[in-house]
Amino acid sequence: MIDGLHHVQVAAPPGSEEEARRFFTGVLGLVEVPKPEPLAARGGAWLELGGGGELHIGIDPEFVPAFRAHPAFAVDGAERLTALAARLGGAGIEVTWDQAQPGASRFYATDPWGNRLEFITA
């Protein structure tokens, strides 16, 4: 049966790898991991998440941003979540808080191409 989630992939337009690296490593603080050689030619980037998971940025020639389908990134505690929201805001990224889920604090933002991202207390 299923033991966990290995990775989640979000799409990005062709030629956006450097912008992806700036956003996901520079703003969000993720660490890029090398793609296996046979996959590197496809472009994109792989990033390490806490807990052993990965975020894969896949290049899609027919890219359309995803709004409903989105990853939800766990952040350890409300103080760190608030600090991350401030960091995103300082980078010019709009943050929308949502308290509709009882027992959790969360907000939404978008990546540079308009894909929806959720950040929620762990």
Where are the regions that the model predicts?
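Short loop or secondary-structure boundary microenvironments that flank
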Residues: 14, 61, 75-77, 99
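Conserved short beta-strand elements that form part of the metal-binding/catalytic scaffold
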Residues: 31-66, 116-121
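Vicinal oxygen chelate
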Residues: 1-3, 86, 90-122
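Conserved active-site alpha-helix within GNAT-family acetyltransferase domains
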Residues: 15-27, 32, 116
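Short, conserved charged micro-motifs
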Residues: 16-19, 79-84
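Short amphipathic alpha-helices in soluble, non-transmembrane regions
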Residues: 22-26, 84-89
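N-terminal beta-strand motif that seeds the catalytic metal site of vicinal oxygen chelate
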Residues: 1-21, 71
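Short aromatic/hydrophobic contact patches that present stacked aromatics
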Residues: 7-9, 46, 70-72, 106-108
